[in-house]
C-alpha cells in the first residue's frame, strides 16, 4: 500500500509540472514568459561555461572547500557578467506578469506563513552578489512554484521579504531580482 502511494506521488508531481508548463504555453503571456525562459537559459549556458573552465572539484565534505569552490564559480560568473544590472532577466514586462501570477498565491495562508519565517533584520543584496548569509533560504511553497515557470537545475526562486530572487544555488549567487513581487 505504501509502495503504491509512493508511486502515485512520483507520477503526480511530473504530471502537475507538465500541466503547469502547458498553462504557460497557452496563456496570453506566452511571449513574455518565453522571453523569461530564453534569458534564464542564456544565464544557465554562461554558468555551464564558467563551471567547465574550473578544475574538477573532488567530492568533499569539508565546508571550507565547498564554499571556496562556490565562491570560485561565483567569481567566474561575475567576470562573465560584468556590468549586469537588476532587471536583466526580470525586465519590467516580465516583472509585471510575475506580479500578476503571484498575486493570488500571496493570499494563501501557507505562502504567508512561509514568508513570515525567521524575519531577521533586512540584509542587503545585489545582482551578482552572494545570497545574504543572514537571510534564511526561504522554502518556496508548492502553490508558488506551480504559479511560476519551471527553472533549470540549480536555479531557484527565493523570497527576501517581498522581493523575488532568482538564485544560482551552485554559486550561491543572486542572478536577478524583482522588487515588490508580492503585495
Language-model region placement:
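Bacterial N-terminal signal peptides
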Residues: 5-14
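A generic structural micro-environment signature
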Residues: 7, 42, 49-52, 56, ...
Amino acid at each position: 500500500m505504501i509502495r503504491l502511494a509512493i508511486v502515485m506521488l512520483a507520477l503526480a508531481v511530473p504530471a502537475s509540472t507538465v500541466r503547469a508548463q502547458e498553462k504557460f504555453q497557452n496563456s496570453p503571456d506566452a511571449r513574455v514568459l518565453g522571453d523569461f525562459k530564453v534569458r534564464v537559459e542564456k544565464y544557465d549556458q554562461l554558468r555551464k561555461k564558467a563551471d567547465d573552465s574550473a578544475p574538477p572539484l573532488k567530492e568533499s565534505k569539508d565546508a571550507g572547500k565547498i564554499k571556496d569552490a562556490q565562491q570560485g564559480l561565483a567569481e567566474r560568473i561575475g567576470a562573465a557578467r560584468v556590468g549586469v544590472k537588476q532587471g536583466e532577466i526580470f525586465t519590467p514586462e516580465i516583472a509585471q506578469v510575475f506580479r500578476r501570477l503571484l498575486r493570488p498565491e500571496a493570499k494563501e495562508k501557507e505562502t504567508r506563513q512561509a514568508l513570515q519565517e525567521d524575519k531577521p533584520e533586512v540584509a542587503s543584496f545585489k545582482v551578482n552578489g552572494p545570497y545574504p548569509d543572514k537571510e534564511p533560504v526561504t522554502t518556496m511553497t508548492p502553490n508558488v512554484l506551480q504559479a511560476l515557470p519551471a527553472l533549470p537545475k540549480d536555479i531557484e526562486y527565493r523570497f527576501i521579504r517581498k522581493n523575488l530572487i532568482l538564485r544560482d544555488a551552485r554559486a550561491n549567487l543572486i542572478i536577478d531580482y524583482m522588487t515588490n513581487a508580492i503585495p
